[in-house]
A protein has these predicted regions:
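Short, well-ordered beta-to-alpha junction loops that form the rim of enzyme active sites
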Residues: 67-71, 103-104, 157-158
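Aromatic sugar-binding surface patches on proteins
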Residues: 213-236
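Binuclear metal-dependent phosphoesterase catalytic core
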Residues: 116-200, 231-262
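Contiguous segments within soluble domain cores/interaction surfaces
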Residues: 193-215
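Extended active-site neighborhood of metal-dependent phosphoesterases/phosphodiesterases
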Residues: 1-60, 79-100, 106-148, 152-155
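Short acidic, glycine-rich surface-loop motifs adjacent to enzyme active sites
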Residues: 55-76
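Short, surface-exposed linear segments at secondary-structure transitions and domain or protein termini
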Residues: 165-166, 213-221, 266-273
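Short beta-strand elements
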Residues: 255-279
Length: 279
């Protein structure tokens, strides 16, 4: 189409790959214009064949980063996922693959199996241009991939914060839809992670995972109806005489992040007093 021709003219091919150390990096188009200002999220047969041919030169078991625009396996707003995800997964089955996508302005990790993980990464511009958070409540930012040989770690880097900023805690009364709870948004969560809490220094176990609209996002939109909910929220119900709540997030790599809030007066909004980063 016309737009792709212009891209070719000034930048080059839309599909390309290269190696950095032991990592094979692929960029693949998955937005296809169908006319009348409409598009579909799909990988064409020709592009899928190109990917298979490209990977035929890569040793099986290699670490592969696949960059695309639209999400592939999101559970939230899955109607926007790539249509032919099964064919893509089959083409990738012999490799250790991290699929890096955007499009949604929403952060979601999708673990398909031990060898295939999608990071649908929040946008640097947040929920379209004027917001400091994405639609899931994740801060504006980007994902940092640290590679040593074929070993990988990743961390979400929020703009305006250190890389230790990995969660946002809402004290009791600070999330309008959950007034009795302490709530935490852990944007880089996946099922291998843990979100635990302590009340006045006593371990209370894991927090309850639930789905709701993030408070920071809701506030940025005037708490209007119909906002997108997020699945990486967790809550705990403090006792009536609790003085402090500590949240501990253990990430995919066993790194721990801790944040404490005081509950000095149930009529006063909670004050955050500590954010200690790694243990």
């Amino acid at each position: 189409v016309y737009g792709e021709q212009y891209y070719h003219r000034f930048f080059g091919l839309v599909n390309y790959s290269y190696n950095i150390g032991k990592v094979h990096v692929v960029t693949l188009k998955n937005i296809n214009y169908v006319g009348h200002k409409k598009y579909i999220e799909a990988i064409t047969d020709a592009d899928l064949d190109w990917l298979k041919h490209d990977l035929s030169f890569v040793p099986k078991g290699s670490l592969v980063f696949l960059n695309m625009h639209a999400a592939v396996w999101n559970s939230t707003e899955g109607e926007g996922n790539v249509r032919n995800a099964e064919e893509l997964a089959d083409a990738l089955k012999d490799y250790q693959v991290h699929v890096l996508t955007g499009h949604t302005h929403y952060f979601q990790n999708n673990v398909m199996d031990a060898q295939l993980l999608e990071h649908n990464i929040g946008a640097a511009c947040g929920a379209w241009w004027k917001s400091q958070v994405n639609r899931c409540g994740a801060p504006n930012g980007y994902l940092v991939m640290d590679v040593d040989g074929n070993q990988l770690k990743w961390h979400y880097k929020s703009t305006g914060h250190s890389i230790d900023y990995q969660m946002r805690v809402y004290g009791k009364g600070n999330m309008l839809s959950q007034p009795q709870y302490v709530v935490v948004n852990v944007w880089d969560w996946d099922p291998s992670c843990k979100v635990e809490w302590l009340q006045d220094g006593q371990a209370m176990g894991e927090m309850e995972k639930f789905v709701d609209v993030d408070e920071a996002y809701a506030a940025s939109k005037g708490h209007k109806e119909g906002l997108t909910a997020t699945g990486h929220l967790f809550r705990a119900l403090p006792s009536s005489d609790a003085k402090s709540i500590t949240v501990v997030f253990t990430n995919h790599f066993g790194e721990k992040y801790e944040q404490t809030v005081l509950i000095s007066n149930p009529k006063v909004k909670t004050q955050i007093i500590a954010h200690r980063g790694y243990w």
